[in-house]
Protein backbone atom coordinates (compact mmCIF):
# COMPACT_ATOMS: atom_id res chain seq x y z
CA UNK A 1 0.00 0.00 0.00
CA UNK A 2 1.26 3.48 -0.72
CA UNK A 3 1.63 6.02 -3.46
CA UNK A 4 0.68 4.62 -6.84
CA UNK A 5 2.12 5.59 -10.19
CA UNK A 6 -0.32 7.84 -12.03
CA UNK A 7 -0.58 6.41 -15.54
CA UNK A 8 -2.24 9.59 -16.79
CA UNK A 9 0.57 11.87 -15.61
CA UNK A 10 2.88 13.39 -18.20
CA UNK A 11 5.96 12.12 -16.35
CA UNK A 12 4.65 8.55 -16.41
CA UNK A 13 4.14 8.78 -20.18
CA UNK A 14 7.54 10.39 -20.73
CA UNK A 15 9.34 7.76 -18.67
CA UNK A 16 7.53 4.96 -20.44
CA UNK A 17 8.42 6.47 -23.81
CA UNK A 18 12.10 7.02 -22.99
CA UNK A 19 12.33 3.34 -21.94
CA UNK A 20 11.36 2.43 -25.51
CA UNK A 21 13.96 4.84 -26.87
CA UNK A 22 16.58 3.20 -24.65
CA UNK A 23 15.57 -0.26 -25.90
CA UNK A 24 15.95 0.88 -29.52
CA UNK A 25 19.37 2.38 -28.75
CA UNK A 26 20.52 -0.85 -27.11
CA UNK A 27 19.37 -2.95 -30.07
CA UNK A 28 21.22 -0.68 -32.50
CA UNK A 29 24.43 -0.84 -30.46
CA UNK A 30 24.17 -4.51 -29.44
CA UNK A 31 22.21 -6.16 -32.31
CA UNK A 32 21.86 -9.68 -30.89
CA UNK A 33 20.31 -8.54 -27.62
CA UNK A 34 16.92 -9.96 -26.59
CA UNK A 35 14.43 -7.59 -24.95
CA UNK A 36 12.19 -8.36 -21.98
CA UNK A 37 10.16 -5.61 -20.26
CA UNK A 38 10.64 -1.88 -19.71
CA UNK A 39 8.16 -0.06 -17.45
CA UNK A 40 8.20 3.39 -15.87
CA UNK A 41 8.83 3.33 -12.12
CA UNK A 42 8.95 5.89 -9.33
CA UNK A 43 11.46 8.57 -10.38
CA UNK A 44 12.42 6.84 -13.61
CA UNK A 45 12.31 3.73 -15.76
CA UNK A 46 14.16 0.53 -16.56
CA UNK A 47 14.41 -2.09 -19.27
CA UNK A 48 15.54 -5.71 -18.92
CA UNK A 49 17.87 -7.11 -21.58
CA UNK A 50 19.45 -10.45 -22.35
CA UNK A 51 22.83 -9.40 -23.76
CA UNK A 52 24.96 -11.69 -25.87
CA UNK A 53 28.08 -10.16 -24.32
CA UNK A 54 28.63 -8.58 -20.94
CA UNK A 55 28.13 -4.82 -20.73
CA UNK A 56 29.08 -2.50 -17.89
CA UNK A 57 28.21 0.95 -16.60
CA UNK A 58 30.94 2.27 -18.91
CA UNK A 59 28.52 1.54 -21.78
CA UNK A 60 25.77 3.77 -20.39
CA UNK A 61 27.17 6.98 -21.89
CA UNK A 62 27.33 5.28 -25.29
CA UNK A 63 23.68 4.25 -24.98
CA UNK A 64 22.70 7.76 -23.86
CA UNK A 65 24.41 9.26 -26.90
CA UNK A 66 22.52 6.91 -29.22
CA UNK A 67 19.24 7.73 -27.45
CA UNK A 68 19.76 11.44 -28.11
CA UNK A 69 20.38 10.70 -31.78
CA UNK A 70 17.05 8.84 -31.93
CA UNK A 71 15.21 11.66 -30.13
CA UNK A 72 16.32 14.11 -32.83
CA UNK A 73 14.06 12.28 -35.30
CA UNK A 74 10.97 13.47 -33.42
CA UNK A 75 9.27 10.18 -34.31
CA UNK A 76 5.69 9.55 -33.13
CA UNK A 77 4.61 6.78 -30.76
CA UNK A 78 1.90 4.84 -32.61
CA UNK A 79 -0.46 2.42 -30.88
CA UNK A 80 -1.86 -0.61 -32.72
CA UNK A 81 -4.14 -3.45 -31.66
CA UNK A 82 -3.11 -6.83 -33.07
CA UNK A 83 -4.25 -10.43 -32.76
CA UNK A 84 -2.52 -13.08 -30.69
CA UNK A 85 -1.40 -14.82 -33.89
CA UNK A 86 0.05 -11.58 -35.29
CA UNK A 87 1.88 -10.97 -32.02
CA UNK A 88 3.45 -14.43 -32.04
CA UNK A 89 4.70 -13.88 -35.59
CA UNK A 90 5.90 -10.32 -34.93
CA UNK A 91 7.94 -11.32 -31.87
CA UNK A 92 8.98 -14.81 -33.01
CA UNK A 93 12.66 -14.00 -32.38
CA UNK A 94 12.02 -12.51 -28.94
CA UNK A 95 11.63 -15.38 -26.43
CA UNK A 96 10.66 -13.16 -23.50
CA UNK A 97 7.91 -11.45 -25.50
CA UNK A 98 6.65 -14.87 -26.64
CA UNK A 99 6.53 -15.97 -22.99
CA UNK A 100 4.43 -12.91 -22.14
CA UNK A 101 2.06 -13.43 -25.08
CA UNK A 102 1.53 -17.09 -24.27
CA UNK A 103 0.54 -16.18 -20.73
CA UNK A 104 -2.02 -13.56 -21.76
CA UNK A 105 -5.65 -14.40 -21.13
CA UNK A 106 -7.50 -15.24 -24.36
CA UNK A 107 -9.75 -12.22 -23.78
CA UNK A 108 -6.84 -9.79 -23.35
CA UNK A 109 -6.46 -7.05 -25.94
CA UNK A 110 -2.92 -7.15 -27.33
CA UNK A 111 -1.38 -3.81 -28.23
CA UNK A 112 1.95 -2.72 -29.62
CA UNK A 113 3.66 0.66 -29.85
CA UNK A 114 5.82 1.67 -32.78
CA UNK A 115 8.39 4.46 -32.59
CA UNK A 116 11.14 5.16 -35.15
CA UNK A 117 12.64 1.71 -35.91
CA UNK A 118 11.40 0.04 -32.73
CA UNK A 119 8.24 -1.95 -32.01
CA UNK A 120 7.33 -3.18 -28.54
CA UNK A 121 4.61 -5.26 -26.96
CA UNK A 122 3.08 -2.61 -24.73
CA UNK A 123 -0.15 -1.34 -23.18
CA UNK A 124 1.12 2.25 -22.97
CA UNK A 125 0.42 5.05 -22.48
CA UNK A 126 3.09 7.15 -24.20
CA UNK A 127 3.66 10.73 -25.29
CA UNK A 128 2.57 11.66 -28.82
CA UNK A 129 6.08 11.97 -30.21
CA UNK A 130 9.75 12.21 -29.26
CA UNK A 131 9.74 16.01 -29.40
CA UNK A 132 8.01 15.85 -25.99
CA UNK A 133 11.17 14.29 -24.48
CA UNK A 134 13.88 16.76 -23.43
CA UNK A 135 17.26 15.22 -24.42
CA UNK A 136 18.90 17.04 -21.49
CA UNK A 137 16.37 15.81 -18.93
CA UNK A 138 17.27 12.11 -18.69
CA UNK A 139 20.19 10.02 -17.50
CA UNK A 140 20.97 6.31 -17.33
CA UNK A 141 21.98 5.61 -13.76
CA UNK A 142 22.95 1.98 -13.23
CA UNK A 143 22.93 -1.66 -14.34
CA UNK A 144 21.77 -4.48 -12.10
CA UNK A 145 20.91 -8.14 -12.39
CA UNK A 146 17.26 -9.18 -12.47
CA UNK A 147 15.78 -12.65 -12.87
CA UNK A 148 13.17 -13.01 -15.59
CA UNK A 149 9.75 -12.69 -13.94
CA UNK A 150 11.54 -12.21 -10.60
CA UNK A 151 12.06 -15.96 -10.29
CA UNK A 152 15.51 -17.17 -9.24
CA UNK A 153 14.99 -20.34 -11.30
CA UNK A 154 14.92 -18.24 -14.48
CA UNK A 155 17.76 -16.59 -16.36
CA UNK A 156 19.47 -13.54 -14.92
CA UNK A 157 18.93 -10.52 -17.18
CA UNK A 158 20.64 -7.12 -17.20
CA UNK A 159 18.40 -4.31 -15.97
CA UNK A 160 19.38 -0.80 -17.05
CA UNK A 161 17.91 1.91 -14.85
CA UNK A 162 17.40 5.51 -15.83
CA UNK A 163 15.68 8.66 -14.66
CA UNK A 164 13.80 11.29 -16.63
CA UNK A 165 12.29 14.63 -15.61
CA UNK A 166 10.41 17.46 -17.27
CA UNK A 167 13.53 19.59 -17.63
CA UNK A 168 17.27 19.70 -16.98
CA UNK A 169 16.86 21.67 -13.74
CA UNK A 170 14.64 18.97 -12.21
CA UNK A 171 17.07 16.28 -13.36
CA UNK A 172 20.01 18.03 -11.70
CA UNK A 173 18.05 18.45 -8.45
CA UNK A 174 17.18 14.76 -8.49
CA UNK A 175 20.78 13.68 -9.17
CA UNK A 176 22.02 15.91 -6.35
CA UNK A 177 19.53 14.26 -4.00
CA UNK A 178 20.72 10.83 -5.14
CA UNK A 179 24.31 11.76 -4.28
CA UNK A 180 23.19 12.67 -0.76
CA UNK A 181 21.24 9.41 -0.52
CA UNK A 182 24.39 7.49 -1.50
CA UNK A 183 26.38 9.27 1.22
CA UNK A 184 23.72 8.33 3.77
CA UNK A 185 23.23 4.73 2.59
CA UNK A 186 22.85 2.76 5.82
CA UNK A 187 24.96 -0.08 4.41
CA UNK A 188 27.85 2.32 3.77
CA UNK A 189 27.51 4.10 7.13
CA UNK A 190 27.00 0.76 8.85
CA UNK A 191 30.52 -0.22 7.77
CA UNK A 192 32.11 3.18 8.39
CA UNK A 193 30.61 3.57 11.88
CA UNK A 194 31.00 -0.14 12.70
CA UNK A 195 27.29 -0.57 13.45
CA UNK A 196 26.41 -3.90 11.82
CA UNK A 197 27.48 -6.46 9.26
CA UNK A 198 25.99 -9.20 7.10
CA UNK A 199 27.64 -12.53 6.37
CA UNK A 200 26.21 -14.31 3.34
CA UNK A 201 28.33 -17.36 4.08
CA UNK A 202 26.37 -17.73 7.33
CA UNK A 203 23.02 -16.71 5.86
CA UNK A 204 21.77 -13.90 3.61
CA UNK A 205 19.37 -11.40 5.11
CA UNK A 206 20.59 -11.98 8.68
CA UNK A 207 21.93 -8.96 10.57
CA UNK A 208 24.88 -8.97 12.98
CA UNK A 209 24.76 -5.92 15.25
CA UNK A 210 28.20 -4.76 16.44
CA UNK A 211 28.64 -3.07 19.87
CA UNK A 212 27.77 0.47 18.72
CA UNK A 213 24.85 -0.71 16.60
CA UNK A 214 23.66 -2.99 19.38
CA UNK A 215 23.81 -0.05 21.80
CA UNK A 216 21.54 2.01 19.53
CA UNK A 217 19.19 -0.93 19.09
CA UNK A 218 19.02 -1.47 22.86
CA UNK A 219 18.22 2.22 23.37
CA UNK A 220 15.41 2.02 20.81
CA UNK A 221 13.99 -1.14 22.37
CA UNK A 222 14.24 0.16 25.95
CA UNK A 223 12.50 3.39 24.97
CA UNK A 224 9.85 1.35 23.13
CA UNK A 225 9.14 -0.71 26.26
CA UNK A 226 9.01 2.33 28.54
CA UNK A 227 6.55 4.09 26.24
CA UNK A 228 4.35 1.01 26.00
CA UNK A 229 4.17 0.64 29.76
CA UNK A 230 3.26 4.34 30.03
CA UNK A 231 0.48 3.80 27.49
CA UNK A 232 -1.14 0.90 29.29
CA UNK A 233 0.33 -2.02 27.36
CA UNK A 234 1.55 -5.33 28.73
CA UNK A 235 4.65 -6.89 27.18
CA UNK A 236 4.63 -10.46 25.90
CA UNK A 237 7.37 -12.93 24.98
CA UNK A 238 6.46 -15.83 22.71
CA UNK A 239 8.34 -18.75 21.08
CA UNK A 240 10.07 -18.63 17.71
CA UNK A 241 8.49 -21.82 16.34
CA UNK A 242 5.10 -23.51 16.42
CA UNK A 243 3.50 -26.72 15.19
CA UNK A 244 1.90 -26.83 11.77
CA UNK A 245 -1.69 -26.98 13.12
CA UNK A 246 -1.26 -23.42 14.39
CA UNK A 247 -0.34 -22.11 10.93
CA UNK A 248 -3.08 -24.19 9.32
CA UNK A 249 -5.65 -22.68 11.67
CA UNK A 250 -4.36 -19.14 11.13
CA UNK A 251 -4.40 -19.61 7.36
CA UNK A 252 -0.71 -18.90 6.90
CA UNK A 253 -0.05 -22.26 5.28
CA UNK A 254 -2.87 -21.62 2.81
CA UNK A 255 -2.14 -17.99 1.96
CA UNK A 256 1.41 -17.19 3.10
CA UNK A 257 3.43 -20.38 2.68
CA UNK A 258 5.70 -18.98 -0.06
CA UNK A 259 7.00 -16.41 2.43
CA UNK A 260 7.62 -19.00 5.16
CA UNK A 261 10.72 -21.07 5.78
CA UNK A 262 10.54 -24.80 5.16
CA UNK A 263 9.09 -26.98 7.90
CA UNK A 264 11.24 -28.53 10.62
CA UNK A 265 10.45 -32.18 11.35
CA UNK A 266 11.02 -33.40 14.90
CA UNK A 267 9.25 -35.56 17.48
CA UNK A 268 6.99 -36.86 14.69
CA UNK A 269 5.55 -33.36 14.24
CA UNK A 270 6.05 -30.55 11.75
CA UNK A 271 7.14 -27.15 13.07
CA UNK A 272 7.54 -23.79 11.34
CA UNK A 273 9.53 -20.76 12.46
CA UNK A 274 7.01 -18.00 12.89
CA UNK A 275 6.42 -15.45 10.12
CA UNK A 276 4.10 -13.45 12.42
CA UNK A 277 3.35 -13.13 16.12
CA UNK A 278 -0.46 -12.95 15.98
CA UNK A 279 -1.33 -16.65 16.55
CA UNK A 280 0.89 -16.75 19.65
CA UNK A 281 -0.84 -13.74 21.19
CA UNK A 282 -4.20 -15.36 20.48
CA UNK A 283 -2.98 -18.56 22.17
CA UNK A 284 -2.31 -16.52 25.31
CA UNK A 285 -5.79 -14.97 25.10
CA UNK A 286 -7.42 -18.38 24.73
CA UNK A 287 -5.62 -19.71 27.81
CA UNK A 288 -8.41 -18.30 29.99
CA UNK A 289 -12.05 -17.27 29.76
CA UNK A 290 -12.60 -13.51 29.72
CA UNK A 291 -15.34 -11.12 30.74
CA UNK A 292 -16.13 -7.75 29.18
CA UNK A 293 -14.73 -6.32 32.43
CA UNK A 294 -11.26 -7.69 31.50
CA UNK A 295 -11.13 -5.89 28.17
CA UNK A 296 -9.35 -4.23 26.52
CA UNK A 297 -6.09 -6.15 26.42
CA UNK A 298 -3.19 -4.22 24.92
CA UNK A 299 -0.44 -6.73 24.30
CA UNK A 300 2.85 -5.80 22.67
CA UNK A 301 5.95 -7.78 21.75
CA UNK A 302 9.29 -7.24 20.12
CA UNK A 303 8.98 -10.61 18.46
CA UNK A 304 11.59 -12.02 16.10
CA UNK A 305 9.97 -13.44 12.96
CA UNK A 306 11.37 -15.16 9.88
CA UNK A 307 10.23 -14.65 6.31
CA UNK A 308 11.69 -16.07 3.14
CA UNK A 309 12.75 -13.09 1.03
CA UNK A 310 14.22 -13.71 -2.40
CA UNK A 311 17.95 -13.06 -2.61
CA UNK A 312 17.46 -10.18 -5.03
CA UNK A 313 15.06 -8.41 -2.65
CA UNK A 314 17.38 -8.46 0.38
CA UNK A 315 18.74 -4.99 1.16
CA UNK A 316 20.91 -4.17 4.18
CA UNK A 317 18.78 -4.00 7.32
CA UNK A 318 15.77 -2.78 5.35
CA UNK A 319 14.72 -6.10 3.77
CA UNK A 320 15.90 -9.17 5.66
CA UNK A 321 14.93 -12.75 6.44
CA UNK A 322 15.02 -12.56 10.22
CA UNK A 323 13.78 -9.44 11.96
CA UNK A 324 12.22 -8.19 15.18
CA UNK A 325 8.71 -6.93 14.65
CA UNK A 326 7.30 -4.11 16.73
CA UNK A 327 4.00 -5.86 17.18
CA UNK A 328 0.89 -5.30 19.27
CA UNK A 329 -2.65 -6.59 19.39
CA UNK A 330 -5.57 -4.83 20.98
CA UNK A 331 -8.44 -7.09 21.93
CA UNK A 332 -11.55 -5.14 22.87
CA UNK A 333 -15.33 -4.84 22.76
CA UNK A 334 -17.37 -3.03 20.12
CA UNK A 335 -17.88 -0.12 22.52
CA UNK A 336 -14.12 0.28 23.07
CA UNK A 337 -13.05 0.32 19.41
CA UNK A 338 -13.30 4.07 18.84
CA UNK A 339 -11.20 4.97 21.89
CA UNK A 340 -8.58 2.30 21.22
CA UNK A 341 -8.03 3.38 17.60
CA UNK A 342 -7.66 7.02 18.65
CA UNK A 343 -5.17 6.03 21.34
CA UNK A 344 -3.09 3.98 18.91
CA UNK A 345 -2.95 6.88 16.46
CA UNK A 346 -2.01 9.33 19.21
CA UNK A 347 0.68 6.92 20.43
CA UNK A 348 2.09 6.54 16.91
CA UNK A 349 2.32 10.31 16.36
CA UNK A 350 3.96 10.82 19.75
CA UNK A 351 6.46 8.02 19.13
CA UNK A 352 7.49 9.41 15.75
CA UNK A 353 7.86 12.93 17.10
CA UNK A 354 10.28 11.70 19.76
CA UNK A 355 12.44 10.05 17.11
CA UNK A 356 12.50 13.30 15.14
CA UNK A 357 9.83 12.57 12.51
CA UNK A 358 7.10 15.20 12.42
CA UNK A 359 5.87 14.92 8.83
CA UNK A 360 3.37 12.09 8.34
CA UNK A 361 1.19 10.83 5.51
CA UNK A 362 -1.61 8.30 5.88
CA UNK A 363 -3.52 5.89 3.66
CA UNK A 364 -6.91 4.42 4.57
CA UNK A 365 -7.63 1.11 2.83
CA UNK A 366 -11.25 -0.02 2.57
CA UNK A 367 -13.09 -3.27 1.86
CA UNK A 368 -11.96 -5.29 -1.19
CA UNK A 369 -14.29 -7.34 -3.38
CA UNK A 370 -13.42 -10.58 -1.63
CA UNK A 371 -13.55 -10.18 2.13
CA UNK A 372 -14.55 -11.94 5.32
CA UNK A 373 -16.51 -10.44 8.17
CA UNK A 374 -19.82 -8.68 8.67
CA UNK A 375 -20.59 -5.67 6.42
CA UNK A 376 -21.69 -3.60 9.41
CA UNK A 377 -18.38 -4.28 11.16
CA UNK A 378 -16.46 -3.22 8.05
CA UNK A 379 -18.43 0.01 7.75
CA UNK A 380 -17.99 0.77 11.44
CA UNK A 381 -14.25 0.08 11.33
CA UNK A 382 -13.69 2.28 8.27
CA UNK A 383 -15.63 5.13 9.89
CA UNK A 384 -13.64 4.80 13.11
CA UNK A 385 -10.30 4.84 11.26
CA UNK A 386 -11.35 7.80 9.10
CA UNK A 387 -12.64 9.80 12.07
CA UNK A 388 -9.39 9.26 13.98
CA UNK A 389 -7.36 10.59 11.04
CA UNK A 390 -9.62 13.62 10.71
CA UNK A 391 -9.57 14.31 14.47
CA UNK A 392 -5.76 14.32 14.49
CA UNK A 393 -5.67 16.48 11.35
CA UNK A 394 -3.59 13.94 9.42
CA UNK A 395 -3.51 14.25 5.64
CA UNK A 396 -4.67 10.96 4.11
CA UNK A 397 -5.69 9.29 0.87
CA UNK A 398 -8.40 6.65 0.60
CA UNK A 399 -7.51 3.46 -1.22
CA UNK A 400 -10.95 2.14 -2.16
CA UNK A 401 -10.97 -1.64 -2.04
CA UNK A 402 -7.31 -1.74 -1.01
CA UNK A 403 -7.79 -3.31 2.41
CA UNK A 404 -6.77 -6.83 3.32
CA UNK A 405 -9.49 -9.46 2.91
CA UNK A 406 -9.79 -9.62 6.70
CA UNK A 407 -10.16 -5.93 7.59
CA UNK A 408 -9.61 -2.23 6.80
CA UNK A 409 -6.44 -0.47 7.87
CA UNK A 410 -4.49 2.75 8.19
CA UNK A 411 -0.92 2.79 6.86
CA UNK A 412 1.19 5.64 8.20
CA UNK A 413 4.25 6.91 6.35
CA UNK A 414 6.96 9.10 7.80
CA UNK A 415 8.84 11.61 5.67
CA UNK A 416 12.59 11.61 6.31
CA UNK A 417 15.15 14.42 6.10
CA UNK A 418 15.63 13.73 2.38
CA UNK A 419 11.91 13.96 1.64
CA UNK A 420 11.45 10.22 1.20
CA UNK A 421 8.31 8.50 2.47
CA UNK A 422 8.71 5.31 4.51
CA UNK A 423 5.85 2.96 5.33
CA UNK A 424 5.99 2.37 9.08
CA UNK A 425 2.95 2.24 11.37
CA UNK A 426 -0.12 0.14 10.61
CA UNK A 427 -3.48 0.02 12.38
CA UNK A 428 -5.31 -3.03 11.02
CA UNK A 429 -8.67 -4.53 11.96
CA UNK A 430 -8.88 -8.32 11.79
CA UNK A 431 -12.27 -9.99 11.30
CA UNK A 432 -10.62 -13.31 10.41
CA UNK A 433 -8.36 -14.65 13.17
CA UNK A 434 -10.85 -14.16 16.05
CA UNK A 435 -13.23 -16.45 14.13
CA UNK A 436 -10.57 -19.00 13.11
CA UNK A 437 -9.32 -19.30 16.70
CA UNK A 438 -12.79 -19.10 18.29
CA UNK A 439 -11.94 -16.10 20.47
CA UNK A 440 -14.79 -15.12 22.82
CA UNK A 441 -15.59 -13.09 25.91
CA UNK A 442 -18.63 -12.99 28.18
CA UNK A 443 -20.65 -9.83 27.55
CA UNK A 444 -22.59 -7.83 30.14
CA UNK A 445 -25.77 -9.74 29.25
CA UNK A 446 -24.01 -13.06 29.95
CA UNK A 447 -23.80 -14.07 26.29
CA UNK A 448 -20.59 -15.14 24.55
CA UNK A 449 -19.40 -12.57 22.00
CA UNK A 450 -16.53 -12.30 19.58
CA UNK A 451 -14.00 -9.59 20.55
CA UNK A 452 -12.63 -7.08 18.08
CA UNK A 453 -8.95 -7.49 17.29
CA UNK A 454 -6.69 -4.69 16.05
CA UNK A 455 -3.17 -5.42 14.81
CA UNK A 456 -0.83 -2.53 15.39
CA UNK A 457 2.79 -1.73 14.54
CA UNK A 458 4.55 1.55 15.30
CA UNK A 459 8.14 1.08 14.16
CA UNK A 460 7.47 -1.80 11.77
CA UNK A 461 10.60 -3.83 12.37
CA UNK A 462 13.54 -2.81 14.53
CA UNK A 463 16.08 -3.68 11.82
CA UNK A 464 14.33 -1.65 9.13
CA UNK A 465 13.72 1.26 11.48
CA UNK A 466 17.40 1.17 12.45
CA UNK A 467 18.37 1.55 8.78
CA UNK A 468 15.91 4.41 8.31
CA UNK A 469 17.30 6.21 11.37
CA UNK A 470 20.86 5.84 10.07
CA UNK A 471 19.90 7.43 6.73
CA UNK A 472 17.60 10.08 8.24
CA UNK A 473 20.39 11.38 10.48
CA UNK A 474 23.28 10.44 8.20
CA UNK A 475 24.75 8.52 11.15
CA UNK A 476 24.78 11.68 13.32
CA UNK A 477 22.23 10.43 15.83
CA UNK A 478 20.53 12.65 18.41
CA UNK A 479 22.56 12.69 21.61
CA UNK A 480 20.20 10.30 23.40
CA UNK A 481 20.70 7.67 20.67
CA UNK A 482 24.42 8.21 20.05
CA UNK A 483 26.32 5.05 21.05
CA UNK A 484 29.18 7.24 22.29
CA UNK A 485 28.04 10.65 23.55
CA UNK A 486 31.26 12.27 24.77
CA UNK A 487 34.99 11.82 24.20
CA UNK A 488 37.54 13.42 26.50
CA UNK A 489 40.59 14.63 24.58
CA UNK A 490 43.49 15.76 26.81
CA UNK A 491 45.96 18.31 25.46
CA UNK A 492 48.82 16.50 27.21
CA UNK A 493 49.54 13.88 29.86
CA UNK A 494 49.80 16.52 32.62
CA UNK A 495 46.00 16.93 32.67
CA UNK A 496 45.24 13.21 32.93
CA UNK A 497 44.25 13.23 36.61
CA UNK A 498 41.58 15.91 36.02
CA UNK A 499 40.42 14.16 32.84
CA UNK A 500 39.88 10.94 34.80
CA UNK A 501 37.89 12.88 37.40
CA UNK A 502 35.64 14.22 34.61
CA UNK A 503 35.33 10.70 33.19
CA UNK A 504 34.24 9.26 36.54
CA UNK A 505 31.74 12.06 37.20
CA UNK A 506 30.03 11.64 33.83
CA UNK A 507 30.08 7.83 33.95
CA UNK A 508 28.36 7.92 37.34
CA UNK A 509 25.58 9.99 35.74
CA UNK A 510 25.06 7.39 33.02
CA UNK A 511 26.71 9.36 30.20
CA UNK A 512 28.35 7.21 27.52
CA UNK A 513 31.83 8.71 27.64
CA UNK A 514 35.33 7.69 26.61
CA UNK A 515 38.78 8.99 27.62
CA UNK A 516 41.17 9.09 24.65
CA UNK A 517 44.65 9.25 26.14
CA UNK A 518 46.34 7.90 23.01
CA UNK A 519 49.37 10.18 22.63
CA UNK A 520 50.57 9.50 19.08
CA UNK A 521 48.03 11.77 17.41
CA UNK A 522 47.65 15.53 17.37
CA UNK A 523 44.62 16.97 19.16
CA UNK A 524 43.10 18.45 15.98
CA UNK A 525 43.46 15.10 14.23
CA UNK A 526 41.64 13.44 17.12
CA UNK A 527 38.84 16.00 16.91
CA UNK A 528 38.43 15.37 13.18
CA UNK A 529 38.49 11.62 13.77
CA UNK A 530 35.67 11.73 16.31
CA UNK A 531 33.69 14.21 14.26
CA UNK A 532 33.87 11.76 11.34
CA UNK A 533 32.58 9.08 13.73
CA UNK A 534 29.62 11.39 14.51
CA UNK A 535 30.39 11.66 18.24
CA UNK A 536 28.26 14.59 19.54
CA UNK A 537 30.71 16.17 21.98
CA UNK A 538 34.46 16.32 22.46
CA UNK A 539 35.67 17.67 25.81
CA UNK A 540 39.00 19.43 25.29
CA UNK A 541 41.00 19.54 28.52
CA UNK A 542 44.18 21.56 28.78
CA UNK A 543 46.13 23.05 31.67
CA UNK A 544 43.85 26.10 31.80
CA UNK A 545 40.77 23.88 32.23
CA UNK A 546 42.56 22.01 35.05
CA UNK A 547 43.46 25.22 36.90
CA UNK A 548 39.94 26.69 36.54
CA UNK A 549 38.12 23.36 37.01
CA UNK A 550 36.31 23.86 33.73
CA UNK A 551 35.68 22.16 30.38
CA UNK A 552 35.82 23.33 26.77
CA UNK A 553 33.47 21.58 24.35
CA UNK A 554 33.82 21.05 20.61
CA UNK A 555 30.72 19.65 18.93
CA UNK A 556 30.62 17.37 15.91
CA UNK A 557 29.22 20.34 13.96
CA UNK A 558 32.39 22.28 14.90
CA UNK A 559 30.72 24.61 17.40
CA UNK A 560 33.01 25.72 20.23
CA UNK A 561 31.75 26.19 23.82
CA UNK A 562 34.44 27.40 26.22
CA UNK A 563 34.79 27.65 29.97
CA UNK A 564 31.90 25.58 31.31
CA UNK A 565 31.99 24.54 34.95
CA UNK A 566 32.04 20.75 35.35
CA UNK A 567 28.51 20.83 36.78
CA UNK A 568 27.34 23.08 33.91
CA UNK A 569 28.83 20.73 31.31
CA UNK A 570 27.12 17.76 32.93
CA UNK A 571 23.74 19.53 33.01
CA UNK A 572 24.26 20.70 29.41
CA UNK A 573 24.71 17.13 28.15
CA UNK A 574 21.96 15.68 30.35
CA UNK A 575 19.48 18.29 29.11
CA UNK A 576 20.26 17.46 25.47
CA UNK A 577 19.64 13.79 26.26
CA UNK A 578 16.43 14.22 28.27
CA UNK A 579 14.95 16.58 25.67
CA UNK A 580 15.95 14.19 22.88
CA UNK A 581 17.42 17.15 21.04
CA UNK A 582 18.92 16.89 17.58
CA UNK A 583 22.42 18.37 17.52
UniProtKB/Swiss-Prot annotation:
Chain residues that bind Zn(2+): 278, 329, 455
Cofactor(s) the protein needs: Zn(2+)
Cofactor descriptive note: Binds 1 zinc ion per subunit.
SUPFAM superfamilies xref list: Class II aaRS ABD-related, Class II aaRS and biotin synthetases, ThrRS/AlaRS common domain
Gene Ontology molecular-function annotations: ATP binding; metal ion binding; threonine-tRNA ligase activity; tRNA binding
Gene3D superfamilies: 3.30.54.20, Anticodon-binding domain, Bira Bifunctional Protein, Domain 2, Threonyl-trna Synthetase, Chain A, domain 2
GO cellular component terms given for this protein: cytoplasm
UniProt catalytic activity: tRNA(Thr) + L-threonine + ATP = L-threonyl-tRNA(Thr) + AMP + diphosphate + H(+)
Subcellular location as annotated: Cytoplasm
InterPro entries: aa-tRNA-synt_IIb, aa-tRNA-synth_II, aa-tRNA-synth_II/BPL/LPL, Anticodon-bd, Anticodon-bd_dom_sf, Thr-tRNA-ligase_IIa, Thr/Ala-tRNA-synth_IIc_edit, ThrRS_anticodon
Highest taxon of the lineage: Bacteria
Predominant cellular place of this UniProt entry's protein: cytoplasm
UniProt keyword annotation of ATP-binding present: yes
The enzyme's E.C. designation: 6.1.1.3
Transmembrane regions listed in the UniProt entry: none
EC category name: ligase
Record-level GO BP terms: threonyl-tRNA aminoacylation
Keyword field: Aminoacyl-tRNA synthetase, ATP-binding, Cytoplasm, Ligase, Metal-binding, Nucleotide-binding, Protein biosynthesis, RNA-binding, tRNA-binding, Zinc
Region span, Catalytic: 185-478
Quaternary assembly: Homodimer.
Family note: Belongs to the class-II aminoacyl-tRNA synthetase family.
Job description of the protein: Catalyzes the attachment of threonine to tRNA(Thr) in a two-step reaction: L-threonine is first activated by ATP to form Thr-AMP and then transferred to the acceptor end of tRNA(Thr). Also edits incorrectly charged L-seryl-tRNA(Thr).
NCBIfam families the record matches: thrS (TIGR00418)
Name of the molecule in the record: Threonine--tRNA ligase
Taxonomic source organism: Borrelia duttonii (strain Ly)
Amino acid sequence: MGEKLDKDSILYKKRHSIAHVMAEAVLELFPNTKIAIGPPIKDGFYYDFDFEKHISEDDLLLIEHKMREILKTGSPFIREVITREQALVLFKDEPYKIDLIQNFDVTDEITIYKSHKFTDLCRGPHVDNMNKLDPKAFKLTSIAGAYWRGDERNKMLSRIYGTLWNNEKDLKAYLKLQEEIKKRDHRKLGRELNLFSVHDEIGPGLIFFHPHGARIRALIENFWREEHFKNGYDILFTPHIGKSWLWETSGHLDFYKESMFEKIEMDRSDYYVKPMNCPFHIAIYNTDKHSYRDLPFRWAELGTVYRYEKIGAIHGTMRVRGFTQDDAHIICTYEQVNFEVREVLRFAIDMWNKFGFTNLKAYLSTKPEKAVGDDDDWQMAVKVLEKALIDFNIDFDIDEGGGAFYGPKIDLKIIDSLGRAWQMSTIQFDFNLPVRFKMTYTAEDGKEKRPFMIHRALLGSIERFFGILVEHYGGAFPVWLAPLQVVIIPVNSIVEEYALEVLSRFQNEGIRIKFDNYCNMRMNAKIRQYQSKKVPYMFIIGEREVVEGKISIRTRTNEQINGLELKEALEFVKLKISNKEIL
